[in-house]
Amino acid sequence: MKEFVFYNPTQIVFGENQTKNIGRYLKGKKCLFLYGGGSIKQNGIYDKVVESLKKYNVLFVEKSGIKPNPVLSFVYEATELANKENIDCILAVGGGSVIDSAKAIAAGFYYDGDVWDFFIDKAQIKQALPIYVVLTLSATASEMNSGAVITNEKTKQKFNIRGDALFPKISILDPTNTYTVPKNQVANGSVDAIVHLLEGYFTKQYPNTPIQDGFVETLVKTIISSTNQILEEPQNYDARANFMWSATLALNGLTTAGIGAYAFPNHMMGHSLSALYDIAHGSTLSVVFPAWLKYNKDKLAQRLQRFGKEVFGIDNQTRAIEKLEDFFASIGAPTKLKDVGLSQSDIEAVAQNAVSLAQKWGLNEYTKDKIASILKFAL
């Protein structure tokens, strides 16, 4: 195991009916209440949150309309509103898009320049508004990490930020809040969580990490089984709970602590698909990841052999890739470029867009030609 420092200050409050307690943690504060397209008003979560805020005399200003691929223009608008209203914290009620937007707004609140400076490494995040979360969609683990991803609509760049100040203070994880999540969003969340786990698993440089390998394999198996249960029984509490906590653990730093250097090449390519064509994040990964595995099949032969055996009970690296791709397809996730409306003629534009993020992330071996070659496996 490699040396590491594990730091994660987010307090998790997990369980049924915990949403009603959010006001207790915000007592005496004035918060910016963020949410997405309004589904929380249809499923009752909005009413629970507002009732709790009023019970504990929490002042709040609402801002809704966050898109599945959150955009910079919203961050600008909401940051201006937060300053105007003298906000002292942010409450994000939603999934990764809402939480990521909250983090960008929190970072921009105290910064005199353009918040995009943080995304292009022109400035470092030194201070941010405190963030509180009521999770309604399991996928990104943004509820328990310090990262955020935002799309700049003008430059067509989907970039990320990270900083200790962006860890949420408290995140409420109530599995019942996910009972009404549509099947396509369940599928996207499942893919996202699995790829979060497997990027490190397949790209790590240090070989002897049995604890981390076991974590990843168990979590992937749990996500697969709970996803299948959820699609059959949307209100199966245990399935929702297992899925929710697995997705959080997939990117809260625990599974990668001690594995040494690792990378996220599939997220890099997926971000370009989202930036250019506004494709859901999970859908980009279900297309790109099997293609990346096929491209690297020989290089990853030993890892694929173990993955196939431990996760699917098979002893064949090609079949291991096929089984994962088959699972993605079985839950309704796209696995080919044509499934998201793209063809070979789009590959060059995606590869060109991805190069800048590859360079930002230090993935210099991912040239335009290499990225294009990988994407051809998704035709």
Language model regions located:
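Active-site segments that bind and position negatively charged phosphate/pyrophosphate groups
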Residues: K204-K323
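Short Gly/Thr/Asp-enriched flexible loops that form oxyanion-binding sites at enzyme active sites
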Residues: T79, V98-D112, M144-N145
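C-terminal charged capping/lid subdomain of soluble metabolic enzymes
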Residues: L304, E310-L379
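Residues at alpha-helix caps and immediate loop-helix transition turns in enzyme cores, especially N-
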Residues: G44-Y46, F74, S101, R303, ...
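ATP/NTP phosphate-donor binding region
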Residues: M1-C89, L337
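Short alpha-helical scaffolding segments that buttress acidic/His motifs in well-ordered protein cores
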Residues: I194-L198, R240-L251, F289, L324, ...
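A glycine/threonine-rich phosphate-anchoring loop and its flanking beta-alpha core
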Residues: Y111-N208
